[in-house]
């Protein structure tokens, strides 16, 4: 039935399955470690995830070491993406002017936020959630370039 109410335990079960899947299946995007090492730049993470979720994801993928304390969540600002608040907060925290920042983003909302913050925006379509037309949606929001593989970031950053 399509009009049947959901069981009361539906949301908790979905949340638990989501957490279990992340805990057992989350892996770093191929090539990300080599790419980060080769960039020779000040790096930060600015994500819509919760602070706790960010720490868990970075630790599980082995990426924590690259960012140190420079991990920022939309929970730290008034408005999340597509507003520029998170990226502006990150730049300010790093002591860098927005125009000197480059954002690597896999979402159209994130590209829009980067453009609104007057930052260079590079779209990334190598994630499992990126299907046909995703690159076009990133370009439509103002991405300066779009790459599918992490190794290609070196050519556009």
Regions found by a protein language model. Give the residues of each.
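Asp-based, Mg2+/Mn2+-dependent phosphohydrolase catalytic module
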Residues: 9, 33-37, 41, 50-157
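Conserved serine/cysteine hydrolase catalytic core
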Residues: 44
